[in-house]
């Protein structure tokens, strides 16, 4: 895999993948096969739509040299989804995208799984244990008003911001479970409505 980053000259595209990284072009070659910048831009858009926290800087790091197995897994799953589910994917993108999947899969040989975290994800992010607003949770309608709400080790209380919303259990395995409050039902069955009468049910 050969990657060349260009910082000067007129940008070949107005896409945020270039502008937010201060680049004018990204030239990527996979086993002598050039990867078009338009394909990289489309790939990033789909990856970011599926995983909003995966930003332009993370994507560039992934292209240059993957350094985290979990991020690499997300990266590859989105590429594979494009190949298997995106019906309008231009035919000339299939070979270079397949090459990316094949080549980047080999990085798993070098990368080791993350050490288990002993920190509570919710405690670290939430202020004073209060619900906080989030955008674009995969599995919920894009127009839904969403909040992350404490559960399990955290007391379930009545919060004013949750009026008119239902609570759903998250499938996350993170230490200290949490709930998602939404004014619209989820689009996937992996999120189920929270039943407070079953407190021992793990999210």
Curated annotation (Swiss-Prot):
Family annotation (Pfam families)? Tenui_NS3
Give the Gene Ontology MF terms in alphabetical order: RNA binding
InterPro entries reported for this sequence: Tenui_movmnt_prot (IPR007974), Tenui_NS3 (IPR043105)
Task: List locations, semicolon-separated.
Answer: Host cytoplasm
Q: Which UniProt keywords apply?
A: Host cytoplasm, Host-virus interaction, Inhibition of host innate immune response by virus, RNA-binding, Suppressor of RNA silencing, Viral immunoevasion
Alphabetical GO CC annotations of the entry are: host cell cytoplasm
Query: Chief subcellular site?
Result: host cell
Question: GO terms for biological process?
Answer: symbiont-mediated suppression of host innate immune response
| Magnesium is among the record's keywords | no
* Record keyword RNA-binding present: yes
Write out the transmembrane intervals.
Answer: none
UniProt subunit comment: Homodimer.
Q: What does the sequence similarity comment in the record state about its family?
A: Belongs to the tenuiviruses p3 protein family.
Q: In UniProt terms, what function does this protein have?
A: Acts as a suppressor of RNA-mediated gene silencing, also known as post-transcriptional gene silencing (PTGS), presumably through the binding of dsRNA.
Q: What is the name of this protein?
A: Suppressor of RNA silencing p3
- Species this chain originates from: Rice hoja blanca virus (strain cr)
* Taxonomic lineage from the root: Viruses, Riboviria, Orthornavirae, Negarnaviricota, Polyploviricotina
């Amino acid at each position: 895999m050969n990657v060349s980053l260009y910082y000067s000259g007129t940008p070949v595209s107005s896409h945020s993948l270039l502008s937010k990284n201060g680049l004018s072009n990204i030239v990527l070659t996979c086993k002598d096969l050039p990867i078009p910048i338009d394909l990289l831009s489309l790939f990033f858009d789909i990856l970011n739509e599926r995983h909003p926290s995966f930003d332009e800087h993370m994507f560039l790091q992934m292209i240059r040299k993957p350094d985290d197995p979990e991020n690499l897994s997300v990266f590859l799953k989105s590429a594979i989804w494009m190949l298997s589910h995106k019906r309008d994917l231009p035919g000339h993108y299939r070979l270079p995208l397949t090459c990316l999947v094949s080549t980047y899969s080999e990085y798993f040989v070098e990368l080791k799984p993350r050490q288990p975290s002993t920190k509570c994800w919710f405690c670290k992010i939430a202020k004073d244990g209060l619900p906080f607003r989030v955008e674009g949770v995969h599995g919920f309608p894009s127009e839904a008003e969403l909040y992350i709400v404490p559960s399990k080790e955290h007391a379930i209380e009545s919060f004013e911001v949750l009026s008119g919303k239902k609570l759903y259990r998250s499938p996350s395995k993170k230490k200290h479970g949490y709930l998602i409050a939404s004014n619209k039902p989820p689009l996937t069955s992996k999120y189920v409505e929270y039943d407070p009468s079953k407190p021992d049910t793990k999210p």
